[in-house]
């Protein structure tokens, strides 16, 4: 029985309209040998038999053990999280424009804001952004609006910022008259050389962007850079992995006065890895800048009868109130991801988050230490890291990654495209999901690959 409602004449008309000769041509990017003409299912089998057959076939698929990080991380997601998120009240609900329309949804966002403000040490949080990269771009725009003392629209950025974040930042700000200066990183420790900051002392900056842990996994000298920025009248934008804040000091404690705005990618907290997302960005700030913060903000209030309720607050910033000057941007997808993150943080609690972060660091430390024992392999930088580290290899890193795939391991992120000096370097990441057996298999596979191709 065909479940396609179109007649042959209708299909032909549609194909003629788009200039295709057949339906198969629409799928020509899939190699012919990979296409299945039939599912090869026997006639007359029942649902149980069909399910068992499909399960048996699915079990033939093999998933490599993943040691890639670079901004998106494999963490364990308790089954309860997406079981709750998938409930219709959350899963099919639309982003609330009227506070009274969805008190439960608003409370979830309020709880998210409370937890993110606590995690980052800031006074206020919004309801999320599209992803970490756009959260940074919006943070830069926010800082420029907020810093009335700055005479320019220049922003100083440490070179070890995630390259994708930088590209998104440049794209969003391209026609807004904003200029960027880059501080080169120290090749010995993989982070910004604070002594080089004085080279920029005579330039007026509206903001300084610090990522820690940075793209190369290293912990930046956040105190020195923060104090320098404030001394020269710039606001400090912290870009960070929220999971790291469970064991590292919060951006509110950076330097003498703390960062002014904090942003980053929220994916590590309950959101599964996916090509293209949806993920969500987070943004928190000091109260002095809250009226320039983009995105929705949920507040707690009381109604006429004195009953506690939740509402969208500071709505004059939003698109449905002042479209021409709106700072708001969020969509329903991000609201759903925020729900997952809220449940994730609630289930794990402060102790659970700390345990996840600690085990992730310990596993990465173990992996790096064991790799460095292999002849010709070494840890690239001599400074502290969180859950990913750059490893130098005696062979081309891209070749190494390809060969490790044959051993069932996604070995890490090839850095040659990021920097020409790192053609023989990969960035490896371990989290709480990696077992001692996984790490042992990585080490043995590395020895095998290097022996096979002459490393």
UniProtKB/Swiss-Prot annotation:
It catalyses: N(6)-[(R)-lipoyl]-L-lysyl-[glycine-cleavage complex H protein] + glycine + H(+) = N(6)-[(R)-S(8)-aminomethyldihydrolipoyl]-L-lysyl-[glycine-cleavage complex H protein] + CO2. It comes from the Bacteria. GO terms for biological process: glycine decarboxylation via glycine cleavage system; nucleoside metabolic process. Keywords: Oxidoreductase. GO terms for molecular function: glycine dehydrogenase (decarboxylating) activity. Its EC number is 1.4.4.2. The glycine cleavage system catalyzes the degradation of glycine. The P protein binds the alpha-amino group of glycine through its pyridoxal phosphate cofactor; CO(2) is released and the remaining methylamine moiety is then transferred to the lipoamide cofactor of the H protein. Belongs to the GcvP family. N-terminal subunit subfamily. HAMAP family: GcvPA. The glycine cleavage system is composed of four proteins: P, T, L and H. In this organism, the P 'protein' is a heterodimer of two subunits. This is Probable glycine dehydrogenase (decarboxylating) subunit 1. It comes from Francisella tularensis subsp. novicida (strain U112).
């Amino acid at each position: 029985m065909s479940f396609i409602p179109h007649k042959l004449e209708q299909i032909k008309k549609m194909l003629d309209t788009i200039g295709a000769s057949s339906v198969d041509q629409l799928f020509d990017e899939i190699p012919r040998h990979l296409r299945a003409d039939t599912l090869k299912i026997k006639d007359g089998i029942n649902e149980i038999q069909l399910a068992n057959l499909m399960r048996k076939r699915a079990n033939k698929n093999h998933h490599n053990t993943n040691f890639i990080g670079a901004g998106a991380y494999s963490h364990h997601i308790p089954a309860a999280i997406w079981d709750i998120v998938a409930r219709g009240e959350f899963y099919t609900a639309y982003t609330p424009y009227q506070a009274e329309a969805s008190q439960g949804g608003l409370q979830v966002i309020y709880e998210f804001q409370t937890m993110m403000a606590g995690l980052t040490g800031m006074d206020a949080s919004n309801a999320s952004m599209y992803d970490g990269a756009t959260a940074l771009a919006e943070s830069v725009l926010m800082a420029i609006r907020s810093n009335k003392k700055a005479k320019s629209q220049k922003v100083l950025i440490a070179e070890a910022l995630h390259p994708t974040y930088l590209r998104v930042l440049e794209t969003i700000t391209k026609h807004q008259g904003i200029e960027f200066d880059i501080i080169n990183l120290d090749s010995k420790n993989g982070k910004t050389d604070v002594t080089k900051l004085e080279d920029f002392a005579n330039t007026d900056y509206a903001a300084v962007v610090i990522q820690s842990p940075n793209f190369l996994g290293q912990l930046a000298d956040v105190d020195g850079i923060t104090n320098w920025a404030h001394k020269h009248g710039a606001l400090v934008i912290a870009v960070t992995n929220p999971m790291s804040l469970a064991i590292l000091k919060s951006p509110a404690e950076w330097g003498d006065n703390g960062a002014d705005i904090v942003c980053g990618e929220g994916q590590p907290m309950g959101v599964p890895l996916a090509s293209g997302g949806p993920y969500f960005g987070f943004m928190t700030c000091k109260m002095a800048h809250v009226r320039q913060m983009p995105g929705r903000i949920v507040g707690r209030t009381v109604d006429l009868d004195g009953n506690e309720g939740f509402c969208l607050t500071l709505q004059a910033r939003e698109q449905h109130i002042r479209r021409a000057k709106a700072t708001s941007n969020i969509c329903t997808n991000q609201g759903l991801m925020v729900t997952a993150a809220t449940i994730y943080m609630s289930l794990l609690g402060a102790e659970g988050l700390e345990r996840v972060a600690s085990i992730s660091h310990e596993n990465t430390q173990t992996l790096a230490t064991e790799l460095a024992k292999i002849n010709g392999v070494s840890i690239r930088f001599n400074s502290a890291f969180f859950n990913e580290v750059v490893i130098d290899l005696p062979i081309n890193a891209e070749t190494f990654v390809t060969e490790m795939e044959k051993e069932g391991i996604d070995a890490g992120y090839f850095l040659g495209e990021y920097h020409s000096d790192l053609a023989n370097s990969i960035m490896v990441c371990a989290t709480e999901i990696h077992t001692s057996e996984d790490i042992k298999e990585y080490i043995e596979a590395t020895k095998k690959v290097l022996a096979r191709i002459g490393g």
